[in-house]
Amino acid sequence: NVSPNIFFEDTSSEENIKRLPILGKIAAGIPILAQENIEGYLPYDDNDADFCLRIHGDSMINARINDGDIVFIKQQSTVENGEIAAVLVNDSATLKRVYFVDDTVQLRSENPKYKPMVFSKNNCDNFRILGKAIALYTKF
């Protein structure tokens, strides 16, 4: 016999939980975690994530990432082919699948109504990878 209280006990350790900043918009030239970019904080108990990005729009709906969702990002400057990443394009952050095709980098949406953004590997001044998407927070 098991007490029903086992389902309601908090077994997490406070020391493993960190508060991750939620970024609504990221401006070019400003450090990612600059105070003006932060719209709040979200507790998270996985040490891999460094910040969160609030999603605006429907470009990733086929990956089940919807408008208003929050994506947890591990800050890193590279990703593997086909991974979902937070990318700074010109002066705004976006979430896309990153593909390396021949001498190009393609940022693809998960919604067929959006065309891929294509950049030459030799001229990547217009974008940079901010980090890899590792988790999703969504409301029903």
PLM feature spans:
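Short proline/glycine-enriched turn/loop segments at secondary-structure junctions
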Residues: V118-D125
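Well-ordered beta-strand positions enriched in small/hydrophobic/aromatic, beta-favoring residues
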Residues: L53, A85-V87, L107
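PDZ-domain C-terminal substructure recognizer with occasional recognition of PDZ-binding tails
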Residues: K96-V118
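Short, positionally conserved secondary-structure boundary motifs
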Residues: N1-N66, N81, S92-A93, F100-T104, ...
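Short, Lys/Arg- and Gly-enriched loop/turn segments at beta-strand edges
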Residues: T78-A86, T94-L95
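Hydrophobic beta-strand signal
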Residues: V71-I73, A86
